[in-house]
Amino acid sequence: MTRDPIATARTLSEALPYLQRYAGAVVVVKFGGNAMGDEAAMAEFARDIVLMRQVGVNPVVVHGGGPMINELLGKLGIKSEFVRGKRVTDKATVEVVEMVLSGLVNKRIVQAINDQGGRAVGISGKDDDLMVCVADDPDLGFVGKPVEMNVQVLRDLYNAGIIPVVAPVATGMADNETFNVNGDTAAGAIAGALQADRLLLLTDVAGVKDASGEVLSQLTPSQVREMVASGTISGGMIPKTETALAALDEGVRAVVILDGRTPNACLIEIFTDEGAGTIIRSTEPRVKPRVRR
């Protein structure tokens, strides 16, 4: 492929205001969806995260792993049940969830980042009591709702130049209690506790769509609530927007729902005029106005 050096230089030059804007910023990235099962996509994601770290951004990666959990549960003959889009997690299931998230998925992402020249360390919500949970809903079993966040361990890691990679498994208030935490919920809680500049929720859709199916580039919290009430936002997008609104309430400056299958999606969002996906925020000045597609 022939590269245009002038175009490359122009792109780098146009990124300067955003490089300055995000120097030292904390960006929490929820990595999930089909990209997790694609080695090439994971390598590309890892490169983006390493580049963000290299130019002074402090990325914190939180991941899911639903497809891998389903695969192992199937092999073990354990049936999955879902209530309102969340996995019902009994004692046997939570052990499998922890095995997959903390032992398999987490270390794959850590290795992918390290293979790209970064320094990543994998932890779970149990480490240093990062996330302490109570049961989210009696119908869901060991599905946790974070009630205590202890994020100093994350600050210690990124202040040392290390990229934290967090598996959404948490401890409970009682001894020897383990909870499965929805990945988006965990990412939102971590972003709120860190007062992150951005929360990026990578998914398998281009963003939040209007009634005609067009992706909306920007939304305010009140617009999101209206779209949920009208049914325009439905299905799996509801918990994502709920996470976004909760994160904004906790002090996150903006949340972006974007397609993790898009090459360099994180870099496009952070470092270009166009941005990516749907940004949800209260009024906030930009370095300069974005022309969001």
Swiss-Prot record:
GO BP, one annotated term: arginine biosynthetic process via ornithine
Site (Transition state stabilizer): residue numbering on this chain: K30, K240
Reaction(s) this enzyme catalyzes, per UniProt: N-acetyl-L-glutamate + ATP = N-acetyl-L-glutamyl 5-phosphate + ADP
Subcellular location: Cytoplasm
UniProt-annotated binding residues for substrate: G65, G66, R87, N180
PANTHER family, per database record: N-ACETYLGLUTAMATE SYNTHASE (PTHR23342), N-ACETYLGLUTAMATE SYNTHASE, MITOCHONDRIAL (PTHR23342:SF0)
Pathway: Amino-acid biosynthesis; L-arginine biosynthesis; N(2)-acetyl-L-ornithine from L-glutamate: step 2/4
Protein species of origin: Cereibacter sphaeroides (strain ATCC 17023 / DSM 158 / JCM 6121 / CCUG 31486 / LMG 2827 / NBRC 12203 / NCIMB 8253 / ATH 2.4.1.)
Keyword Protein biosynthesis recorded: no
Coarse class of the protein's main subcellular location: cytoplasm
Function: Catalyzes the ATP-dependent phosphorylation of N-acetyl-L-glutamate.
InterPro entries: AceGlu_kinase-like_sf (IPR036393), AcgluKinase_fam (IPR004662), ArgB (IPR037528), Asp/Glu/Uridylate_kinase (IPR001048), Glu/AcGlu_kinase (IPR001057), NAGK-C (IPR041727)
A GO molecular-function annotation: ATP binding
EC number: 2.7.2.8
Annotated Pfam families: AA_kinase (PF00696)
Family assignment from sequence similarity: Belongs to the acetylglutamate kinase family. ArgB subfamily.
Protein encoded by which gene: argB
Protein name in UniProt: Acetylglutamate kinase
